[in-house]
Amino acid sequence: MSAAPQHVTVLLAEAVEALAIRPGGVYVDGTFGRGGHSRAILAKLDADGRLIAFDRDPRAIEVARALPDPRLTAVHAPFSAFAEELDRLGLEHVDGVLLDLGVSSPQLDEAARGMSFRFDAPLDMRMDTSRGQTVAQWLADASVAQITEVLRDYGEERFAYAIAKAIAAARAGGAVASTRQLAEIVEKAVRTREPGQHPATRSFQALRIFINQELEELSLVLPAAVERLKPGGRLVAISFHSLEDRIVKRFMRDESRPPQLPSRLPLRAAELPQPRLRLVGKSQRPGPGEVAANPRSRSAVMRVAERTGGAA
């Protein structure tokens, strides 16, 4: 029997330090995964501290609920349900929010999840296997134009149209139902290859992001987090590809600038609205040692912002 897939938490010490944890504070881990960040946060909290950990993956929630720590509340929901779940728990504000974005190693390494072209498995890709369409189900009905749009917008795939046509041609002879089948279709349709990268990498990324609505979830949770952060509370986001990082970077940049007002408004400087966030340091990437030990960390980017007293 093979060992269970292991998840190596990226930027573990750096992310926990960036949260500037108050021992008695309330914190949110937006993606519990296998609990690396959550355990490190709990280690910094005293008996009055509290951690709310979200995850869409039922298996991640099983791991979280098995931890014998009364300070931890595990929530089986996407992090876009942030405000709703805080209301349910009777929490108005929190002291820090950590978002470790993207897919976890166990999800990639467990063949049955259908997220990787390294295995032959049902073409699923859902983070929450208890709800929603699988990629195979979506591909069965999607038009060439729809498939092209997803591959282009979420995978930045140059050969999106050629791949979409190849998928449509292949499904005429039967459903595109397995990861290997899809990978072979893409491999034949891609005319040039990027060094060190499988031709299906961008397509698999695009379909996974789309089927899980990852970018939409991120765009929803960022403003919700700022609304609920106490002044001085930190928002820490770790992204793993340019699409995620672009959203985080733009949001933090925009929220760290004063609101745009008509220039002729009769307001004194002290009366002008203040920005809601203050950027903390520069973006941070894993060091050479971490990348050598965990090659999947190489694309990670961490950004940090602190809630000001600016009006919500």
From Swiss-Prot:
The gene is rsmH. Residues 279-312 are annotated as: Disordered. This is Ribosomal RNA small subunit methyltransferase H. The keyword Transferase applies. Its EC number is 2.1.1.199. Specifically methylates the N4 position of cytidine in position 1402 (C1402) of 16S rRNA. GO terms for molecular function: rRNA (cytosine-N4-)-methyltransferase activity. SUPFAM superfamilies: Putative methyltransferase TM0872, insert domain, S-adenosyl-L-methionine-dependent methyltransferases. Keywords: Cytoplasm, Methyltransferase, rRNA processing, S-adenosyl-L-methionine, Transferase. Its main location: cytoplasm. Belongs to the methyltransferase superfamily. RsmH family. It is found in: Cytoplasm. GO terms for cellular component: cytoplasm. S-adenosyl-L-methionine binds at residues 35-37, 55, 79, 100, 107. It catalyses: cytidine(1402) in 16S rRNA + S-adenosyl-L-methionine = N(4)-methylcytidine(1402) in 16S rRNA + S-adenosyl-L-homocysteine + H(+). InterPro entries: RsmH (IPR002903), SAM-dep_MeTrfase_MraW_recog (IPR023397), SAM-dependent_MTases_sf (IPR029063). It holds the Pfam family Methyltransf_5. One of its GO terms (biological process) is rRNA base methylation.
